[in-house]
């Protein structure tokens, strides 16, 4: 069975999946990917959109396996029309994302990127001048929007550090209260028609911090930029953006109170190992005609 992992992986990862009979094709290799499409039966997908055009060019495709949980980068309707199964892997990256969320919170509170820049530029004492904006997590109220696997791991970490946790989900809590009364707000929601631009930073508590390791489209990015520039928000820790890859001249990147990462909260060696194992199990099940794990379409 022709299985292709569409991802810019390391040499070690390439060797690992080759040993399993899986071909690794870099997301940046558009020509190579197009050449593989006619023969692909199983596509392991990370972030490069699986469009209707991609699906149409893959006549043998039987399974699109999301490496991760969010399937907003897959044209699920096009796959469904072709009878192609779509599966995800909930939980394989939860600990990695929870830890990265905590890291971004602390980096915002301690202005970590600016401190590193000051030390490297031999401006040691200049960094001390930021002291009035340094803060601790203990004693703060942290609002979690969404309460799935990631926030359930994150909440006890925050409480162990002295934070008070409140949350909103589709079944519990009040959205406006959590958004408007939290000292820090962390996003843990899927991106869909109901959640797109759900979060307006202007409705957050003045001086609060926004952390997003879910999807960039959850936030009104223009409003976020305004809130960070005028001081309504103290800082933002962002692993995801409305447009990815992000332009180097994006105005958010020019702000000193933005801590950013290139959508890697999920990406650890442990996450990849768990994901490859689970994805291989679905390959086995597909070949054996057994029910697939975590099928969403």
Stretches with model-predicted labels:
Residues 1-42, 287, 295:
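N-terminal glycine-/charge-rich "phosphate-binding" loop or analogous flexible N-terminal tail
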Residues 28, 67-68, 84-95, 169, ...:
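Short beta->alpha connector loops at strand-helix junctions that form conserved
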Residues 52-55, 164, 170-251:
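Rossmann-like adenosine-cofactor binding region
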Residues 82-84, 90-141, 156:
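Phosphate-binding beta-alpha-beta segment of Rossmann-like dinucleotide-binding domains, i.e.
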Residues 147-148:
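Glycine-rich Rossmann-fold phosphate-binding loop(s) that bind the pyrophosphate
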Residues 159, 209-297:
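Rossmann-like dinucleotide-binding domain for NAD(H)/NADP(H)
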